[in-house]
């Protein structure tokens, strides 16, 4: 039996003691991740991600096919493929801060560091021309924190300076189990079931930093939206070897990912604090958060010394994630 084990480690890009924060590892740190399911991760092995995430036409006997299930059929008899990838990130966000007059005061920076297992994949043969693959990898990540101190005269003169903070964290993980079959020489077909699970939390805090006695009983508002995701989707894929010999290989590939509603359970809570009491409001429901329907097509050429690939992807996301968009007033 041939056993191929691939373990890849990406070194940590940097470490800032002043901004390092504990807690769960994060792979995104951007205000744009506050929408939908967050920032989509580049999937695949390290080699695939190093080439920009190409892999729909990737066909190898020594590397798991993590993007196209049709590639599972390339697994050699009496072999077993196992891949582990470790990723390190130093993520930093910078925001301009302005004073009450609207003039720029300083550049505020914040960052997070993480080291985490990125993907785990195994692939093995079931019969001649028939293979199975199982993989676990991150699908999307949420990580952001933004703050604003409102010192306008009409606010500060009534209740004091008001501080607003928006933050969020979480991720969605993808587990894929599929089968690839080569019914004809150089032509393969694959199907895979995908399970998505994870939790995403969005938080909002509004508080009076310098409460003026007697002017208002309002102190703070704390809100949290938590999404619990657990849903199945599926994928189909094709691969065709136009050229396949000992010197070079030219492969065409395509996949279709069925998206649609994730229908996560969402729990919304609101805590109102004032000088006299604390009120808590909580409600649960089902969100319309969804994944896009996706079509990929590509071609890959490689020989012992050279490899190149080109891919095209079309995603139809719909409007199911628009509920996360919030309208905000002018904060100067």
Language-model-detected regions and their locations in the chain:
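Bacterial Sec-dependent N-terminal signal peptides
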Residues: 1-22
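N-terminal, post-signal peptide beta-strand-biased segments of exported outer-membrane/organellar beta-barrel
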Residues: 17-138
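Outer-membrane beta-barrel porins/channels
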Residues: 18-50, 121-332
């Amino acid at each position: 039996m041939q056993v191929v084990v691939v373990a890849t480690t990406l070194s940590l890009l940097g470490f800032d003691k002043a901004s390092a924060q504990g807690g769960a590892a994060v792979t995104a740190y951007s205000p744009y991740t506050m929408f939908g399911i967050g920032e989509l991760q580049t999937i695949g092995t390290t080699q695939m991600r190093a080439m920009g995430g190409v892999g729909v036409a990737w066909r190898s006997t020594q590397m798991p096919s993590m993007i196209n299930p049709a590639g599972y059929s390339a697994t050699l008899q009496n072999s077993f493929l196992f891949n582990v990838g470790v990723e390190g990130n130093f993520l930093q966000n910078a925001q301009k801060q302005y004073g009450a007059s609207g003039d720029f005061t300083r550049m505020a920076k914040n960052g997070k560091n993480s080291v985490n297992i990125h993907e785990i994949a195994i692939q093995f043969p079931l019969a001649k021309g028939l293979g199975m693959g199982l993989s676990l990898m991150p699908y999307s990540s949420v990580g952001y924190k933004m703050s604003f101190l409102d010192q306008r005269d009409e606010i500060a003169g009534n209740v004091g300076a008001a501080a607003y903070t928006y933050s969020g964290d979480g991720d969605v993980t993808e587990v894929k189990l599929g089968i690839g079959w080569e019914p004809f020489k150089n032509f393969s077909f694959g199907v895979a079931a995908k399970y998505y699970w994870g939790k995403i939390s969005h938080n909002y805090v509004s508080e009076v930093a310098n409460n003026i006695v007697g002017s208002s009983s309002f102190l703070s508002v704390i809100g949290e939206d938590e999404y619990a995701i657990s849903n199945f989707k599926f994928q189909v894929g094709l691969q065709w070897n136009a050229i396949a010999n000992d010197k070079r290989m030219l492969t065409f590939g395509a996949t279709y990912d069925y998206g649609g509603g994730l229908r996560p359970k969402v729990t919304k809570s609101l805590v109102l604090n004032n000088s006299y009491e604390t009120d808590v409001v909580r409600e649960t429901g089902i969100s319309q958060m969804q994944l896009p329907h996706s079509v990929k097509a590509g071609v890959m050429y490689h020989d012992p010394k050279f490899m190149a690939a080109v891919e095209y992807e079309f995603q139809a996301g719909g409007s199911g994630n628009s509920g996360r968009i919030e309208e905000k007033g002018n904060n100067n």
